Each structure stands twice: as C-alpha cells, then as structure tokens.
Design a protein with these regions (language model features):
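C-terminal target-recognition/interaction regions appended to catalytic cores
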Residues: 98-229
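Class I S-adenosyl-L-methionine
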Residues: 1-143
C-alpha cells in the first residue's frame, strides 16, 4: 500500500543518513524451496566504510540474492500444477507427473510426520459449518476465507489473520499447528509449547519467516560479509 511504501522509503532514508549502503529484492519463499506463495521485500545494508569498492553511493554491490535459491519463479509457474479436485475425505492420490514434489503441501506433511508431531492436535474446531467445509474442492483457494489447500500444490501465504481459514486437503478440519509449521519448513523436531494459546500459536507461525528462506538469506549474508574481510 502507499502507506507501507512511505514507511519503507523513510526507513531507507534513515539507513542512508546513518551511513549505510543497501540492496533490496522482492523475494518469494518458493524460490528457496518453501511450499508457499509468500512475497516479501528484503532489505540488507552494511556501513559504507566497510565496503570499499563494493558500493556505488547508497547502493550496495555484489550481493548475490540468488546464490542459495532452488528455483526461479518462472520455472515454478511453468510446472503443471493441479488446479482443483472434488473433496474426498481420507482420499489417497499420487503426485502428478512433472510437479516438483518437494514444493507440495503433502511432501512437507510427510517430511515432518505431522500426524505424530506434538502440535498435531492443535487446531480450531468449528462450532458449525462442517457441511460448508465438505463442499469446498481440494485446491479451491479462490475465496477470501475458507481456502482448501491442494496436497500436490504449494500453499498460499501461511498467515491466518483477518478471518483467513485454511482447510486440510483431505480432512474435514482446519490445518493443525503441526501442519502450518511444516509449511513454514521448520525442522520436524521444532514444536510450540503446550502453555501457548491456540491463537498465539497460529499468530506466531504466521508471523514467522519460512525456515528455508531465512536459512538461504543467512548463508548469503555470511558469504558476503566473509568476502569483505
């Protein structure tokens, strides 16, 4: 939005005034192997007196944003992703040919053994609306609220505020905290404590940066700073 843009540009001006050169990129979590369509603007800066020739004015040079990416967005968009399938509770299907399985919801559910995860039973149970849940096709994420994920596709952004509800691909319920953590590509050993409220668990997960994205950017920063020595 215009308000967010104004805040962002003011933040950059403050960094320039404090003696930093910066680089920025609109990055999608899919590029780093996380199974969710999540765009974020990333900004990285270093004090100018540490950069030598690695800058041009306020622009930081030589930062290889793509170094640890697994995919390009153009490649991702070109795969033959399935669209929608009639919801069938408990159904079992195979990954379609030509689809990168490691970018799919089902792959990460299995990878993180979500059925046996400490947060497996942490999900909101609706007071009503079960019939409505059953009417939504697998993969129908076109609505503002009730979005049913497709097991052989990536997820929309893992964020559940503003009445956004994500449904399990082949179960009559919302996603569990264990499943949401898996879509954030966290190690399967990572769990949220029992004394957190369900609301705070999902808020914490939604506010997080996908693990594979943050790991890739952290390695890029490490390599860049090592190159300045």
């Amino acid at each position: 939005t215009a308000r967010h843009r104004e805040f962002y540009e003011e933040l950059k001006r403050k960094l320039f005034h404090a003696g930093y050169s910066t680089t920025e990129r609109l990055t999608n979590a899919l590029e780093y192997g996380a199974p969710q369509d999540r765009d974020r603007i990333l900004l990285f800066g270093v004090q100018k007196d540490l950069l030598g020739e690695q800058r041009k004015g306020n622009a930081l040079l030589g930062f290889d944003w793509q170094k640890y990416q697994s995919y390009t967005l153009s490649d991702i968009r070109s795969f033959p992703w399935p669209e929608t399938t009639a919801f069938a509770e408990g159904s079992v299907t195979d990954c379609p040919e030509g689809v990168p399985e490691s970018l799919t919801v089902e792959y990460w559910f299995r990878q993180n053994d979500v059925e046996n995860h400490p947060n497996a039973n942490d999900y909101f149970t609706p007071r009503g609306g079960i019939a409505k849940m059953k009417d939504i096709d697998e993969g129908d994420d076109s609505k503002k609220s009730y979005k049913r994920l497709h097991r052989w596709r990536y997820s929309p952004t893992v964020a559940y505020g503003n009445n956004e509800v994500h449904l399990h691909p082949y179960k009559v319920r919302r996603l569990s905290a264990a499943e949401a953590l898996a879509l954030q590509t966290l190690p399967k050993e990572f769990a949220l404590p029992d004394d957190m409220t369900l609301t705070n668990k999902f808020k914490t997960i939604g506010n997080g940066v996908p693990y594979l994205l943050s790991s890739g950017i952290a390695k890029t920063i490490r390599d860049y700073l090592n190159g300045l020595k």
